[in-house]
Every structure is written in C-alpha cells, then in structure tokens.
A protein has these predicted regions:
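Conserved N-terminal phosphate-binding loop of PLP-dependent enzymes in the Aspartate aminotransferase
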Residues: 1-427
C-alpha cells in the first residue's frame, strides 16, 4: 500500500471540506512516534490535536479498553447505566477546582460538551445570551461556530448562526489588546447589545487553543468572575484543549485564584477515545430536566474505561510535573534561538502548552508564510507540528507528556535546524 494511492482514493471518496494536513497515512504509532504505510517514522508533536497527553497506545489504556471490550461495548447510559460512568464522575468531581458540591455529565466530543454547557447555563439562569471572545474556538456545531471567534476556515458559508451570542476581544499584549480593553468591550456590550440580566454565561478558554495558545491573564479571569458575580452570569471555562496535565495542572483553572461555574473537557480526557464532559456546581448541573442531557454514545463504556486509565497514568507518571519540566526546556530552546531567528516574536504558554509566534522583522506583521515553511520543513524531516492563531502565524507544540527524553531531544534538534534553515542561518 502506497501513500500516493491512498491519497488518490481519499480525494475521490471524501469531500474537500474535511481538510487534511498530511499526505501520508498512518500504519502504527507508539507513545510519541508514528509510522506511515511505507514505513517512514515521524515524531508526533500534534498528538491528534491535543488528544494524546498520555501518548499513543499507552499499555494501561490498551489494557483498560481490552478488559471493557470483553464485558460490554455499549448499552446507552441513559437506558442501562454502568458503574464506571458513575465512578469516573466521582473522580472528576473530586479533582475539578472548587470545594463546592459538583456533578459531571459525559458526552462524546468537545463541541458536544460546549453545546451542553450552554444548555445547562441557559436552563439554570433562564437567560439566552452568551458572551465569547475573539480568537476563541468552541467547536464545529452551529452553536460552536457561533461562539468561535475566527471566521476562516470554520465559519465560511455556514451561517446564519444561533443568535444571542456576542464577542469581545481577548487580551493579547503582543497585538495591543489589554485586559482593560477586553473588560471595557464587555461593558460596552451591556450598553449597546444586550442587557446583562439577559446573559446566561461568559465562556472563555484559559489558554486559547486554535486562537494561538494565548494564556488568559490572571487579572482578566478575576475581572470576568467579578462581572459574573455582579450580574448573576455563569462563568464557563472551556478546557477541551487545556485539560488533563497539558498546562502543568490537571485543569488550567487551577492556575487562577477564582473559580468557574462550569468546565468543559474532552480531548486528552480519554487518551484517544471519544469522550467529553461538563463538570460544575451541582445546583447548576441539576438545572436541566431529566432527559435534557445525554446522547446515544455519550459516556461510552470503552471511552470511560480509557479515562480511568488516563487519570491513573497522570498520577503515577507525574505528568503535571513532567509537563512543566518539558515545557521549560522547550521555552528555553526557543528563546535561545531568537537572536538567530528574528521572526520569533513571542514564546508563551503554561506547562507544556507552548507556542511560538512569528512576526515579520521590522514591520511586526504576522508572518504566516514563514510559519508554513517551518511546519513543512519540519514535516519533511519527520517532525509533526501544528499551526494555529487568527493569522496562522503560530506554531503550537502538543507532544505527548509521556515522550521519552531521547525522542524529545531529537525533536528539538530538528526544530532548531528547521528554524535556522528557514531564516537562512547555517545550522
């Protein structure tokens, strides 16, 4: 089987709207390494878009799924429940930030988690409005797209979107947006667009994912909490990409001294299996009537079994600490290259949720072309990187936190060579 043959078949059989970054096809993977159908090896710094904090095919996860497979694969939790769902909810309730009573519901995708968080918030408050932020990404469903603060490629030609959704700028110091600017914009929304007493929720990412790995400043999160408290609005932290040790904490909200009312989760929750969830204040979570939440595959037993294993791995292998350690090494490497690579304008992110932003020297304009060249040259050398950002000028690093030190060092050496080569500096 050849990559070229599969590519031709893919083009004939699947729509162009499903954009695919690579022109090779996976055959097998192990931890942070992946091999294509022709035997070529790649170091995976994409991890299925932040899904594999515990790596490809971790033995504990493989065993957990296999054991569950030998018992049953599906009952639909709303029809015939199972203990593992309840036990996982108990674990999430115990570990999520906040000492108040909590409840958790499970779904299948990150977009589903966001949709259900909005449903819960509207049910709890009796209000319709939602405020989101520019650069935010919340999924590809209609409500997810309405909340998302980036047009191309996610929202092109798909409207109209659900109403009563409003956007404010997200703080971004590099591009001149301060916390004060963001809060002032929310206050203006209250004057010009929607009465705050009609707003059910404010939803934000503690670190924006697709928007460029922009961390929310602590003063911004405090200000959001203050606004919510003043107006009876619920605060939703979308942790689909930040959760489960990526930022050096189990939840990114643990970096802040205020709490969200609801937290969405998905991606690395189940180590490659489709599982998402919403955890939040028990009284808020109970606002939806029986039958109002759920889904045919929501909380699938195979995915739930995998999630139990993920939590064990994070604890046993100290992945929160490992995330901080690896992230510090990567940030130091990228910072050391700024003298040789003047396009490096910013290196940022907590734990191992690291990104580098490229701007054109002199003009300070976003350099998407340079960013794409870095990504493609890295791919040619066997290193998978993802691009993000409103201007597509940011490379984000999403390596498995279980990556071995030799493979991590090899990847950083490739990255250094590629950056220097792209800018024209001898490696």
């Amino acid at each position: 089987m050849k990559n070229a043959d599969l590519q031709a078949r893919k083009n004939a059989a699947t729509p162009r709207g499903v954009g695919v970054m690579c022109d090779f096809y996976a055959a097998r993977a192990e931890n942070a390494e992946l091999w294509d159908v022709e035997g070529r090896r790649f170091i995976d710094f994409a991890a299925g878009i932040a899904v594999l904090n515990t790596g490809h095919r971790h033995p504990k996860i493989v065993k957990a799924i296999s054991d569950q497979l030998n018992s049953f694969t599906h009952t639909a939790y709303q029809i015939v429940p199972y203990a593992s769902y309840v036990e996982l909810a108990e674990k999430i309730n115990d570990r999520a930030p906040g000492d108040f009573p909590k409840k958790t519901a499970f779904f299948t995708t990150g977009a589903e988690a966001v949709e259900n968080a909005i449903k819960i918030a509207r049910a709890a408050t009796g209000r319709p409005g939602v405020i989101a932020f520019s650069g935010g990404f919340h999924g590809r469903t209609m409500m997810g797209m309405a909340l998302t603060g980036k047009v191309a490629p996610y929202k092109l030609n798909f409207g109209p979107f659900p109403g009563d959704v409003f956007h404010a700028p997200y703080p971004n110091a590099l591009h001149g947006v301060t916390t004060a600017d963001s809060i002032k914009a929310i206050e203006m929304l209250f004057k010009a667009d929607i009465d705050p007493k009609r707003v059910a929720a404010i939803i934000f990412e503690p670190v924006q994912g697709e928007g460029g790995f922009n961390p929310a400043p602590a003063e911004f999160v405090r200000a959001l909490r203050k606004i919510c408290n003043e107006h009876g609005i619920l605060l939703i932290a979308d942790e689909v990409q930040t959760g489960f040790a990526r930022t050096g904490k189990l939840f990114a909200m643990q970096h802040y001294d205020v709490l969200a009312d609801l937290i969405t989760m998905a991606k690395s929750l189940a180590g490659g299996m489709p599982l998402s969830g919403v955890v939040g204040r028990a009284d808020v979570m109970d606002a939806a009537a029986p039958g109002g939440l759920g889904g045919t595959y929501a909380g699938n037993p195979l995915a739930v079994a995998s999630a139990h294993a993920v939590l064990e791995i994070i604890d046993e292998e100290k992945l929160c600490e490992r995330a901080t350690q690896l992230g510090d090494v990567l940030k130091a490497k990228l910072t050391s290259l700024q003298a040789d690579v003047p396009q490096i304008a910013d290196v940022r992110g907590p734990g191992a949720m690291i990104a580098v932003e490229f701007l054109k020297p002199g003009s300070g304009e976003p350099d998407a072309e340079f960013t794409k060249r870095v990504q493609m040259r890295a791919l040619e050398r066997g290193l998978l990187l993802l691009v993000c950002g409103v201007y597509s000028n940011v490379v984000r690093f999403l390596f498995p936190l279980t990556i071995t030190q030799p493979v991590f060092d090899e990847a950083l050496a490739i990255l250094e060579e590629v950056l220097k080569e792209t800018v024209g500096v001898p490696a």
